[in-house]
């Protein structure tokens, strides 16, 4: 689960991180009062969407010369003018795709005198089984580009979970970021509290880009991105309350209600599979034969008829889907249950695109019998390769 920048900053502020004062607004009429409540005279108006690259983004409704989704304002009047241009419009960034995202809220923040921009993130480094700091002196830009072009400028410092962030760890991180003086002193408290927040809130990612050194020498969190482990949300009511469903795909929201692992993708072949590994293999073979998957959908090992039907309905609700491939290996999941779920869903929503089903495992013959006797236009496949060829051929006509 992701949250907005202003929510992430509020959470970090609660741990003692240095963040600027700011106010989130939903209506243009709130802009003037919000700006006047801040010290000024420099302000920043930030689009709040769940996507990066906002500053370089462009609004669909505005001219190509118009400013992006993060703007400096030098007066209250300037803030108000920018808010009126930005709020309610569609921001297109490198991460949103061509459709973009509607800006339903803005964050008006007090400006900062920036001396240097740095990059700092925390994530789970699975190669060593520890939470690690990933840092770079090249902040304020696309870290993927830095990793590709100048990987030597990125350093990773793994933290021992038994000790937490030690003075030696702080020294390593500070050295990597070339922090000294007031910034070096700030680092002694900042990095341990970031680690504490990451662990206590079960985050999967905490990214600060940029972390700045101000002209007065002190550190400040200028931007913050947080992602949380969805499997741990049951113990974080405060985090769940921050969820903004308007930023999420409606199909993914519906899938979460059924405890389905569903991720919307950009292709045209819908996939329903049991098991993450089999789902990845299914998507790979679809790409091998020249098409793209429309989703990742893992119904899990113990899904019942209703859950299978729900998954099928979610997949067919995607207008991009031109064909559906069901690929099930029945272990705990029984093939007859899958067959019954698919048939129930097809009868409810109708079948307007080709459907190929490959079943193998527990009760496979019964599952095939149920499908064959359904009277529906369902194409059976003998194995995964056969299934992929058949669904691609059906779409190609």
Curated annotation (Swiss-Prot):
GO molecular function terms attached to this record: ATP binding; magnesium ion binding; succinate-CoA ligase (ADP-forming) activity; succinate-CoA ligase (GDP-forming) activity
Amino-acid positions noted as binding substrate in the UniProt annotation, renumbered to this chain: 274, 331-333
Catalysed reactions, as listed in the record: succinate + ATP + CoA = succinyl-CoA + ADP + phosphate; GTP + succinate + CoA = succinyl-CoA + GDP + phosphate
Cofactor section: Mg(2+)
Pathway recorded for this protein: Carbohydrate metabolism; tricarboxylic acid cycle; succinate from succinyl-CoA (ligase route): step 1/1
One BP term from GO: tricarboxylic acid cycle
Cellular component GO terms held in the UniProt record: cytosol; succinate-CoA ligase complex
Family: Belongs to the succinate/malate CoA ligase beta subunit family.
Function: Succinyl-CoA synthetase functions in the citric acid cycle (TCA), coupling the hydrolysis of succinyl-CoA to the synthesis of either ATP or GTP and thus represents the only step of substrate-level phosphorylation in the TCA. The beta subunit provides nucleotide specificity of the enzyme and binds the substrate succinate, while the binding sites for coenzyme A and phosphate are found in the alpha subunit.
The protein's name in its UniProt record: Succinate--CoA ligase [ADP-forming] subunit beta
UniProt source species: Rhizobium etli (strain CIAT 652)
The gene coding this protein: sucC
